[in-house]
Amino acid sequence: MGNNKIYLLFVVCFIIQLSCKEESKKAIKTAPVTFKKEGDLRILKKGSDSLLTTLDIEIADTDYERETGLMYRSSMEPGHGMLFVFDDVAMHYFYMKNTEFPLDLIFVDDQLKIASFQKNAQPYKENSLPSKVPVKYVLEVNAGMSDKWTLAVGDSIAYRKTP
């Protein structure tokens, strides 16, 4: 009778094992988000209008583009930036959630003048990065670039969309 119990236990375990199929693991493949040149942007020194730098830019002018920004990207090439264009002049707040590299945020008013900065914003931080004054545009560039270019409040930008 002891052998029957062992045999029955073996059969039950075997049936359970057969019924527990490992579900095939579905690999979710996401395409990397890459830079798409949508315009050119120049930064000009206040007073002299001398050219400080020129950038290839992506333009974020829809709700989705403004909400996503540079999230889910591992880096940004030197000479690239993202220009956020808002419908209204207002206080705008940014954060670095899901952004993988540090950025300088350059806040620009409706006259295309630099109004304030948030320098060296760190990856993945969810703290608020406010514009400090009402603005219409925000330019994101790699961290350290605003100092390298010696940008100051009152400098200006000029941009154009590429066809």
Give residue ranges: language-model regions.
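C-terminal motif of bacterial Sec signal peptides marking the signal peptidase cleavage site
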Residues: 16-19
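Compact, glycine-rich, soluble single-domain proteins
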Residues: 21-163
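Bacterial N-terminal signal peptides that target proteins for export
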Residues: 1-8
